[in-house]
Amino acid sequence: MAISKVTKDLRRLLDAQNIPWEDHSGFSTERTWIPLDNGLVLCCMCSYYITSDGVEHGVTSGFPLKLEVSIIYSIDDYAFGPGAAKTPEEILEVLGIYGTK
């Protein structure tokens, strides 16, 4: 499955900063999980859908420049807190507040 540029940009930035992340993408959603120091997980998500012409991204608000960002309360819990659309650079600022493992 093709990965959106915004997700690739985020993952490159995380790698450049040596910030660990996990790919939890599914059939119709790109998910980048970033474990936080407090045991929570920051989930950065881009939804997409498949058409007869191929993969279309952009179900996420703010796409193509932003990802939906939510807190997951544990690795086993898919219940999201309120999400917000953020650029990869804004996500790094959020990580500065929460700290990463």
Protein language model regions, located:
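Ampiphathic alpha-helical segments that act as solvent-exposed interaction surfaces
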Residues: 6-10, 64-101
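Low-complexity, intrinsically disordered/propeptide-like segments
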Residues: 13-17, 39, 45, 70, ...
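Amphipathic alpha-helical segments
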Residues: 5-20
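Amphipathic, interaction-prone secondary-structure segments
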Residues: 18-66
